[in-house]
Amino acid sequence: MKTYAIYDEEWKMKCPIGYLYYYDKCNEFIIELNRELDKWEAPLLFSSYVEKSIYTIPKEVSMLWVKGRVIPSGRQNIGSILKNHKMKSYDEMKLLELSGGRCSQDNCYIKKVEFEDVPLAIRKRSEDNVLECFTSGESDVICLFGDDTVRRIDLTKLVEANGKIASVLMNKDVYKSVKVGVGGYSIAFNDCIEIEKWLLLKTGKKINVSAKDLYSFVGDNIVDTAKACEILGCSKQNLTYLIDKGRLKPIKPNLKENLFFRGDVEKNSW
């Protein structure tokens, strides 16, 4: 993950208005805003979130912010522009870096920083991100969070907040496809229908995990070496490298074949 501070030359506090997290392996973005922003000071795209005291911007909206600040892929002379900058293909992040994140819409710009440079209060927001998730019954999802809590989310109660949930409940394969969204900021169905962490925490009921739920978890979220290689699109040799580097940990050592938590494997695809 790469981290960028977002500045606004017009903001009175003269410190970053937020931070852009770029997950380069999957080309996804998450923006964390400064809580001192009000809806009038926040970029227009984010004002409705700030008004609701939501300062973690979803990946789709974060991507829209990025796309609004770079040359569009459909521009007539995009080929020559990429060639001039020695780019083999269209890359939003590289174009954003080239422009410094500046555009005619406002006075915002970005500056590369280390994650450790992000204020602790903002970094701590990710401490309760989703670690694992799995389905239970016909319409529930069990989520394990970084703050060591487990919550049961009844999807039928979220249809009003997110109409796309209805299509999830009507298709068992889509329902079973649930996985942790990039960075743990959401859960995702079929890689396209997401429920943000704040909504999961708000509506989910804290539970003591039952044996039935654990059996479901084991069946859905523990994968062998072959499946791990399939998820990451890599060879067994590459998988061994990740294990040696401590980026992937087998559930139990000294087995004839390694087993992994699916969420731990998927983190290496972000």
Q: Where are the regions that the model predicts?
A:
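Broad phosphate/nucleotide-binding scaffolds in NTP-utilizing and phosphate-metabolizing enzymes
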Residues: K2-A121
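Short, solvent-exposed cationic patches
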Residues: L33-S47, E51, K164-Y185
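A short, Lys/Arg-enriched interface patch at domain edges and termini
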Residues: E194-S210, D264-W270
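Polyanion-binding surface elements
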Residues: L214-K236
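Short helix-start
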Residues: K245, K249-W270
